[in-house]
Regions:
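Sterically constrained small-residue positions within well-ordered secondary structures
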Residues: 21-23, 32-34, 91, 107, ...
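Non-catalytic linker/capping segments at the edges of enzyme domains
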Residues: 1-53
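HotDog/MaoC-like acyl-thioester-processing domains
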Residues: 1-11, 104-156
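Short acidic/polar alpha-helix capping motifs at helix-coil junctions
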Residues: 11-15, 63-66, 81, 91-95
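A conserved, well-ordered hydrophobic junction motif at loop->secondary-structure transitions
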Residues: 40-76
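Hydrophobic beta-strand-centered segment that forms part of the acyl-chain substrate-binding groove
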Residues: 72-113
Length: 156
């Protein structure tokens, strides 16, 4: 993809997250993009991300859904305000609630494809629905409630 990922717009002090921080050399460094009204993310688990041979660890799945969904919440908030990502003041979101439904075991060996849509934007809250598929088969669904980071959480 030629465009910048949502996470590449985060200011430095918001770029250290294990799941999505571009400055976390040990992290997952997921990347999320718009595809029309949905956001997309493709992530290939490493062999050590296994629960048992042949299947992806559920905690990793929750982490990827979490970070992709909060990035989507931020991108949607910028869109709702008619702003370009990366403009000041920065809009960054954290997880208030995460519900994950594991529909089928998630196989290793192929990228995880995440597709998210916005269900609601209300004040500081954004509700994001995410579907995770492997090779076209939906394996996991998630619903995340994200809230805008208060200024008190920002280390400057």
């Amino acid at each position: 993809m030629g465009e910048k990922a949502f996470q590449e717009y985060y200011p430095e002090h918001f770029s250290h997250c294990y799941g999505c921080g571009v400055l976390n050399e040990h992290g997952l460094r997921i990347k999320s993009y718009w595809d029309g009204a949905e956001s997309v993310c493709s992530f290939r688990p490493m062999p050590y991300h296994t629960s048992f041979p042949g299947f992806v660890y559920g905690g990793l799945i929750a982490s990827v859904i979490d970070c992709h969904s909060t990035a989507t919440a931020a991108a949607a908030a910028y869109r709702a305000e008619g702003r370009t990502m990366g403009t000041e003041p920065p809009l960054r979101y954290v997880t208030a609630s995460l519900k994950v439904d594991y529909l089928h075991p998630t196989p290793m060996g192929s990228p995880l494809e995440l597709r998210s849509s916005i269900r609601e934007i209300k004040g500081r809250k954004v509700v994001v629905e995410t579907r995770l598929s492997v090779d076209g088969k939906e394996c996991v669904r998630g619903e995340l409630v994200a809230v805008r980071i208060p200024d008190t959480m920002v280390a400057r």
